[in-house]
Amino acid sequence: MQTWQLPEHIADVLPTNARQLESAREQLLALFRVHGYELVQPPLMEYAHSLLTHIDAGLSLKTILVTDRLSGRQLGIRADITPQVARIDAHLLSANQGINRLCYAGPVLHAQPDGLLNMREPLQAGAEMYGFADIRGDIELIDLMLKSMKIADMGKVLLSLGHIGIFRALSDAAHLDAGQSATLLALMQDKDTGAVEAQVKAWKLDGMWAKAFSLLPRLYGGREVLSDARGRLPDLSAVGGALGELQAVCDAFPDCEIHIDLSELRVDNYHTGLLYAAYAADFHDAVARGGRYDGLGGYFGRARPATGFSFDLRSFIGRLPAIERQPAVLVDAEDAEAAHEAVEALREQGQCVVIDYGIGHNVSEELAGRLKKTDGVWQVVKR
């Protein structure tokens, strides 16, 4: 194997793309900041038991584990920043009993890629709100997610909505155990209506519940799905509440194209209620995902309402605006010492100044000029 080879689904980011990513990252954090979201920077590595919450079993398949040479304990390299932010809210920011608005942008590492076209080292960016259970919190985060997609130059975005509360309400009413719920969740994700019908029949569920579960995979489409669901699903207060939340989101974004899928349930995840995602042209999967995950912080000692979204900024490279390198001022190597004060003054003003050693350079072809001493004063002479 060549020494320059990298592992599968791992890649370097070269200067042109690095400028794009850093510019987008700065703009996103600025956007989050003016909406009241404070930046946190959790560590890349933690004790495994802190990263691998019992709530999301699927996270263990993504997490790379190592042994700490200092303590002998098992460490994990984070595969998702959200559990870390939940820990911060629950423990380090526990003095605040009100709302915590937090954001982040940092690398995560996956033991295996999410798909054939995905990288194993995403640059995960996102925003989260803790301590507010009202649907208005979700609407605020969805609005922020859509604004983030504008910065990423995504063009027209489709907003996809779901709600795991509907499935859970039906499961509770039908007295399904955890194993049965997990089985149905997997079948729902596959949109295998025939398999769902066969499974509920095999369990000999009451006709009303069997019909409701068989109906869920068919309840997808535009905003009209909500009125259809109200007329066909069992009259349960939790179901009505979930449909009401979905309606509130639809009303909040009248000009946005919305797709509703009541069988979009995200197997093996920590979400508890409303689910939302953004889709854009030329992407094989959602460009951003979010939802409500009330109680996640309970694993760390403080269960609170929570909602938020995240996305892999690195996956947007093909769509991010090009950021040209700043034209540089060259200074001949033999003049560098004498021109030191002038060089530093230019750099303090934000001007790129490069010492020319006479063997070529990697600066932009468009040079701002060359620093020369004219009439006793160091000046930038245009070419």
Swiss-Prot record:
Single Gene Ontology MF annotation:
histidine-tRNA ligase activity
Alphabetized, the UniProt keywords read: Amino-acid biosynthesis, Cytoplasm, Histidine biosynthesis
Q: Which Gene3D superfamilies match?
A: Bira Bifunctional Protein, Domain 2 (3.30.930.10)
User: Where in or outside the cell is it found?
Assistant: Cytoplasm
Q: Which GO terms describe its biological process?
A: histidyl-tRNA aminoacylation; L-histidine biosynthetic process
**GO cellular component terms attached to this protein's record:** cytoplasm
Chief location of this protein within or outside the cell? cytoplasm
Pathway assignment: Amino-acid biosynthesis; L-histidine biosynthesis; L-histidine from 5-phospho-alpha-D-ribose 1-diphosphate: step 1/9
Q: Which domain of life is it from?
A: Bacteria
Q: Which residues form a coiled coil?
A: none
Q: Give the family, as the similarity comment puts it.
A: Belongs to the class-II aminoacyl-tRNA synthetase family. HisZ subfamily.
| Miscellaneous comment in the UniProt entry for this protein | This function is generally fulfilled by the C-terminal part of HisG, which is missing in some bacteria such as this one.
Q: How does it assemble?
A: Heteromultimer composed of HisG and HisZ subunits.
UniProt xrefs under PANTHER family? HISTIDINE--TRNA LIGASE, MITOCHONDRIAL-RELATED, HISTIDYL-TRNA SYNTHETASE
* Free-text function comment from the UniProt entry: Required for the first step of histidine biosynthesis. May allow the feedback regulation of ATP phosphoribosyltransferase activity by histidine.
UniProt-recorded name of the protein: ATP phosphoribosyltransferase regulatory subunit
Name of the gene encoding the protein in the UniProt record: hisZ
